[in-house]
Amino acid sequence: LSNDYERSNMWRYRDYVVRSFNKDKPYDQFVIEQIAGDELWEVQPKGKKDSDLLIATSFLRMGPWDPAMVLKPQARQLYLDDVINSVGQTFLSTTMRCFKCHDHKFDPLPTRDYYGFYATFAATQLAERQAPFVKMENLIGLNQGKESTRHMLDFSKKKYHELLDKQEMAAKAWYDKRGKKYLEEDKRRSLPDEEKPPRYVGLSPIEQGRLKVRRQDDWIWTRRLERYEPLVQSVYNGPVPKSLNARKMRIPKKIPEKPFPKVHILMGGALEAPGDPVKPGVLSAIGLPTSGDPKNPHVLTNEKSGRRLALAKWIANPSNPLTARSIVNRVWQRHFGKPLAGNPNNFGARGKKPTHPKLLDWLAFDFVEHGWKFKRLHKLIMLSKAYRQSTKHPQIQKLRNEDPENRLLAYREPRRLSAEEIRDGLLVTTGELNREIGGFPIKPEINMEVALQPRMIQFSLAPAYQPSIWPKQRNRRTLYAYRVRGQPDPFLELFNQPNPNDSCDERVSEAVTPQAFTLLNSDLMNDRAIALALRVEKEFDTLRLQVKRAVQLAFGRVPDKQEWNQLEHYVKKMEKHHIEHKPDRPEYPTSITRSLVEEATGLPFEYEEILPAFESYRADKKSHQVDPKTRALADLCLVLFNTNEFMYVY
């Protein structure tokens, strides 16, 4: 896997997707740009090149695999396998891995078609490419982000050079003693052992370990500075580079003009067992030809450039029966909580049959007929009688007995909010949500133990998670939160935020005991409860009106008389409790001591990691900062947040 190295500019792809939906970009264009935007960009005239086309191809860089593993051919195969499967599942609702090693067991998909896709992407190489910032990109916080990242980099460099200078002084002494000319570390690395000093000359085993850590930190923070540069994780067409460096992948100044190796069907999916050669191609079962050759109607161009563009146009062809059905099925699922066709990533024989096949066909036809436009599709669905059904029905029990899965859509099924919707809903209710669109990733406050726990990456430990300093920065939509595969937000993970390593066709909404504990006890929930209490206190003077307003904000309705009296009584009762019990004051560390074992000697060593974000951190209001009355009102707000009425869409 990718060792959790940060892909610093991936925020630009996220913003490209948001811009595309907001502009109501036609879906066929959206598909083509993500698969072959760089090929479109190449033919644009100088001075009129659209950065969005390069940014769009970050879709091909979203997978978990690191292309610079020790076993480079295997790493390359893993990357291509992930891209092929992602394209198949996302745009065609077809699980491509099912016919990688042999012909598909249940669908008319031969292995040759899989390797036709493989050949299509065989010329695709990874690179961070220059792409000027576009007018619509939000660059707020660029200078502040650069400054804080450089502060961490400067600290790492200082510690690194202190150890390196000590090592090189000892190396000079070694050369002087032998009457030889001093050579710097990089220049002497390839020499035989007898012609150079020991590798870590002059350093103790503990210092050796620290030197390795600081060298890695130097690279990590240098890499993170790229987040603020006009770069984009993209691709280009060319032969496989002789050497791959995951730390700095740049497009060559001149791409070598050499023939690409032929792609073969791999018997059993093994690189060591090549079979018949294969040309770039598409899925023959669709019956949509791509060439005028009657013997090979489903092959694509064999030129190094244009393969992906030809594939993208085939996918986005109005006559392709899968593409439009795949996306309208997902849109329907987003509105109703479940799709028309039961497996959004798999329309094959092993997927569930559509409950309303004619409706799916009609929606797909209508979607294409009206320009592949999403906003019209959303409006069409949301104005339908089926969508506007109530969750209440006079014969609900009879319906549940006769149609337990509600396939006939006789009533609206309640849906629990997703992990991101819960957090965003809390911020909307408290009035704290920052509705800015786009920009650099923000870091919400997460559980402190998780934020500071050691997290292994290749050769070292990853830097600790430091939240954004200001509440306005932290309180943006969860869409804009910094996300790293090896350190998920425990709150979001607990409420079934999907694993980012694989395409998620359907959210799980299981209810488990830890969710209840988290909703009552987590810092996120208690901080939002205090924020809501402070909001209603600011808006109204009397407790009775404050209670009414809290219910109105949380539920979108006013409490009935019985609820009102009970809730008011509860607040008065809790105020007495808080007068007698004072809350603890949380502490934020400004540095942390890490412990590791030096791999060459097996000896333990420690080093310091600074946490400058907490030196000027502006935390959310905590219990110790408000009076007993506010804490009691916050307890009421916490109760409201824990109800089904808040957690579910009815």
Regions found by a protein language model. Name each.
Residues 1-46, 79, 108, 159, ...:
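Primarily short, surface-exposed interaction patches in extracytoplasmic proteins
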Residues 13, 55, 113, 117, ...:
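Residues that flank catalytic or metal-binding motifs in active/ligand-binding sites
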Residues 48-154, 158, 492, 504:
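Sequence context surrounding c-type heme c attachment/ligation sites in exported
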Residues 68-80, 123-177, 295, 314-315, ...:
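Electron-transfer interface patches adjacent to heme c in soluble/periplasmic c-type cytochromes
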Residues 465-468, 479-480, 513:
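Acidic, aromatic-lined catalytic clefts of primarily extracellular/periplasmic carbohydrate-active enzymes
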Residues 636:
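Globin-like tetrapyrrole-binding proteins
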